[in-house]
Amino acid sequence: LGPFFMLFFAMCMGDAGYGIVLMLIALYMKQKMQDSGLGKMYRLIGFLGGMTFFVGLFLGTFFGMSILSASWAPSWLKALCIDGWFPDGKIAGFPVQMVLAVAIGVLHICLAMIIKTVNFTKRFGFSKTVSTWGWTTLIVGGIVVISLGMMEVLSAEVFKWVIIALAAVSGLAIFVFNTPGRNPLVNIGSGLWDTYNMVTGLLGDVLSYIRLYALGLAGGMLGNAFNIMGTMILDIPVPVVNWVFCIVILIFGHVLNLAMSCLGAFVHPLRLTFVEYFKNSGYEGTGAKYNPLVKTK
């Protein structure tokens, strides 16, 4: 869970400059408050800042400025930006960063489904998890096969027969053998209901990962807005005052944006972990029932 949380946090921040600030804050606070018992927290902030820095370079944003269009950025740095890898920064008409967020979400959910399948098999046995195996085989296997087909690793003929075999095996597991020993017609009805819940649930879960792109985009646009406001102040024909107000606006704006971005980058990855991931991994929470009102003698 840790690597995915760091990646999600960094994508929500989406700015290499903010990553540097977080690392500097973590380093300063760790040196300043060595005996406070918060060393692990500052180390975590440092790791999150480091991931934010590298992901921010990959996404092409530095303190709200686009690295691709910046005159000060060297060519090797621009080559790291994913938007420059595709024409107009889009894949099939969609922003490449949005596609990246959805792809990472699919990977996250597939990992959860594999863990669910293995754990349920250990707990309940294979005979009671046939349907779970069918869905995992269909979704995870389908994604792998389609990816190999798109990369032309599989020929068109092989791709067709592998998809047919995958669909046939998964269909039998989901609709016919989902509960061995039960009436096949009941199994088919149960499989149809399970299919409805699975399709609608997975669609919502995958689309939920678009928030990684949306939060990063919002933070970048807000940072750019403060940059524009600061440069507009420089047009005031008062040599010293304009620079003072420009610096104040830039510092205030980016501090505010950093604080709001950190809040969103902390909350939303937690939601993706506790809702989308735990649900698809079959995690069942434990705990004591809350019962504050009791009779005492």
Model-derived features: positions:
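Conserved, carboxylate-rich catalytic/transport cores that coordinate ions
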Residues: 1-297
